[in-house]
Amino acid sequence: MAETAAAVYRRFLDLIGQDRWAELADYYAEDAVVEQPYARPEPGVIVGREALRERFAGREGLPLRLTPQDVVIHETTDPEVVVAEFDYEVTITTTGERFRTANVIVLRISDGLIRSSRDFHDVGRITEALSRR
């Protein structure tokens, strides 16, 4: 039996918590679309696994640790669609500053790959904390 969409996303979040950024792009379909309505300075859309790979590679040098907490994944009537609610415990490693941010993500996952996601993150708070590093 194929792995559920919820199980795939839980594994993905585990990698984030382990700072294994280089592996994350492998969870996306080649033509995946990621929408980030709260991205700044303007909403963002990232298209394709390789564009995501480049984006994640840029995270590796940041003094930032994200630990997913209180993860709840809601399955829907469509087995490919899940809604994930969770907090990140954010640590700025250079200053020791810690705080939590809320996140909601709507994902379509099939054949073990993320096809699309709409990510609602508090990027402003994280960006502000990184600017104080």
Task: State the predicted function of each range.
Residues D78-Y88:
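A short hydrophobic beta-strand element
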Residues P68-H74, Y88, A102-L107:
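Hydrophobic/aromatic beta-strand elements that line small-molecule binding cavities or substrate pockets
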Residues Y27-T77:
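A solvent-exposed, acidic/Ser-Thr-rich amphipathic alpha-helical stretch
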Residues Y28-A29, Y88-V90, I105, H121:
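Short beta-strand segments enriched in hydrophobic/aromatic residues
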Residues V90-R100:
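Short, cysteine-centered beta-strand-loop-beta hairpins and adjacent loop/turn segments enriched
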Residues V81, V104-E128:
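Short beta-strand edge/turn micro-motifs at domain boundaries
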Residues M1-D26, E30, R132-R133:
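Short, low-complexity N-terminal intrinsically disordered segments enriched in polar/charged residues
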